[in-house]
Amino acid sequence: MALEALKLISRFLPVAYNEPNDISARAGMLVGSCLAGVSFLKGLGLVHSISHMIGAEYNTHHGLTNAIVLPVVLRFNLEGMDSQTATIAQNMHLEELSAAKLISEIEKLMGRTDIPDNLGEIGVPLDCAHRIAKKAMVDSATSTNPKKVSLMQMEDLVKTSIIGKRTT
């Protein structure tokens, strides 16, 4: 289900964003988002752990916060996960199946849909990184991340999400 959601969203999001009256694109996004929502039952991971804590403290929009944090966490999670990366890239119809290309394409999509580069751009200060990381470590979504994370790694992920810039 998650892969089908990914196919639909990667296909229809740019169209729905640029042509909001395109009913077929909006329908594709509707089905994709429903499938993604059902996929949450398998677990959420670090993107949501961090986003839950950022949203709780800074009242940020959860979807926007997730989008900003996503490439940072993907860089952490996808290292050494070549078969999973290839499956995701194939479902996004990418010719190159590397983690770098996958993340680059996600960042390009973020740029085309006006998603900020980092959490700092939506008002999250760098000095909260340690506190947010500690809270995110005990969030239930952390336990379902495909890769274990230490507090130091979590803090680095939070800091990068706050001040990092997209590579594309």
Predicted ranges, named:
Residues 1-42, 146:
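Carboxylate- and glycine-rich phosphate/diphosphate-binding segment that chelates Mg2+/Mn2+
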